[in-house]
Amino acid sequence: MAGSKCLALIAHDQKKDDMAAFARANQELLSRWKIVATGTTGGRVLDAAPDLDVTRLKSGPLGGDQQIGALISTGEVDALIFFVDPLTPMPHDVDVKALMRLAIVYDIPMALNHATAIKLLPTLEA
């Protein structure tokens, strides 16, 4: 991933449609980025915007959140867009909290909902 800016995309199950719509509507801006995503989210993003450069990692509950956290800690992820569903309990909630903690510790831009992502994306330099 060296040499190009990397954006991580993650969405909880109830927010995957929103992430797919976000990717489709923002293909031009997203095309400037190398994208890493958890498995299912990455698949949905590719279905919606097949020309994007998306690397799919494991599904969130199977370690994908932790994989993205590791990439944040090594400086390989430059920004995070994570569409969180606050109304549905997540069995891997501790992984989600750890991921958000790493984004804060390493001071990378992070959007947790569509409204923030829409404002953040154009301000990021790819």
UniProtKB/Swiss-Prot annotation:
One of its GO terms (biological process) is methylglyoxal biosynthetic process. The active site is at residue 65. The keyword Lyase applies. It holds the Pfam family MGS. It is an enzyme of class 4 (lyase). Its EC number is 4.2.3.3. Belongs to the methylglyoxal synthase family. This is Methylglyoxal synthase. It comes from Rhizobium etli (strain ATCC 51251 / DSM 11541 / JCM 21823 / NBRC 15573 / CFN 42).
